[in-house]
């Protein structure tokens, strides 16, 4: 579960980076072709995986959230959406190849930090650190310094989203009951992607006319996320976890 989720996070930087490189070498018309080839390759790889057949339960409801959404993880779901909305808003702005390369380096730093810095740290330290680092990345918008916005900001976004996403996934897995690991992982990905999508919607739907409002909106979301996590979600999780 952990490894698959990390490949998804790395794709957050590698996808736009690849698109910009294709655009730079061959133009926009080749981007849909390149995307189609990647989708076809993904389909082939998934088709190569053999899943053992398992008989369904005796009572199969017509509608079921099984393998899709974990109802008892709703507080985690809402909190993660709010955090990832900030990432979505920041990524919705115009960026360069350098930006996404630094975003990838930030994700790599998060992997190293998980292995060494947070291995024996307090349980909620990763999420709190991630929110604080993400807030610092947002504050860089006020500097209007191109070097900081092209190098430091994306690295901090990658680092923050990496350590925050890892901890939320582990929370989901430890909150799940027997045979619910697949469901908890699907819920995590749904919250992750929904948050980024809503961030894009917020940027293009409500903040496109005045980009100066972007940092204020992001900081507002982060303040809500920090308060929600520290005073409600984490204590709630400690009472309801199964592992």
Q: Could you say what each language-model-derived stretch is?
A:
Residues 1-20, 189-200:
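Glycine-rich segments within core transmembrane alpha-helices of 12-TM secondary carriers
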Residues 1, 162-177:
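Intracellular juxtamembrane helix-capping segments at the cytosolic ends
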Residues 29-48, 213-235:
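Symmetry-related core transmembrane helices of the 12-TM Major Facilitator Superfamily/SLC fold
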Residues 42-77:
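Flexible interhelical linker loops that connect adjacent transmembrane helices
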Residues 99-134, 192:
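Transmembrane alpha-helices of Major Facilitator/SLC transporters
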Residues 175-212:
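A late C-terminal transmembrane helix in Major Facilitator Superfamily
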Residues 18-26, 117-118, 202-211:
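Interfacial helix-cap and linker-helix signal at transmembrane-aqueous boundaries
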Residues 122-168:
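C-terminal transmembrane helical hairpin of 12-TM major facilitator-type secondary transporters
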């Amino acid at each position: 579960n952990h490894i698959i989720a990390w490949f998804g996070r790395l794709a957050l930087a590698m996808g736009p980076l690849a698109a910009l490189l294709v655009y730079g070498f061959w133009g926009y018309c080749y981007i849909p072709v390149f995307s189609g080839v990647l989708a076809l390759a993904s389909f082939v790889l998934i088709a190569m995986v053999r899943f053992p057949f398992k008989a369904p339960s005796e009572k199969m409801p017509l509608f079921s959230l099984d393998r899709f959404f974990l109802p008892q993880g709703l507080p985690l779901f809402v909190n993660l959406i709010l955090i990832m909305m900030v990432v979505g808003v920041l990524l919705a702005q115009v960026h360069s190849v350098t930006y996404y390369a630094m975003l990838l380096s930030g994700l790599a730093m998060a992997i190293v930090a998980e292995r060494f810095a947070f291995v024996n740290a307090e349980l909620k330290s990763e999420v709190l650190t991630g929110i604080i680092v993400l807030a610092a990345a947002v504050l860089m918008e006020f500097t209007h310094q191109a070097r900081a916005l092209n190098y430091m900001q994306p690295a901090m976004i990658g680092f923050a989203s990496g350590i925050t996403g890892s901890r939320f996934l582990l929370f989901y897995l430890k909150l799940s009951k027997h045979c619910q690991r697949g469901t908890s992982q699907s819920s995590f990905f749904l919250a992750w992607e929904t948050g980024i999508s809503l961030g894009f919607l917020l940027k293009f739907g409500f903040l496109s006319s005045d980009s100066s409002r972007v940092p204020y909106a992001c900081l507002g979301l982060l303040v809500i996320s920090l308060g929600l996590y520290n005073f409600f979600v984490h204590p709630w999780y400690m009472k309801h976890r199964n592992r």
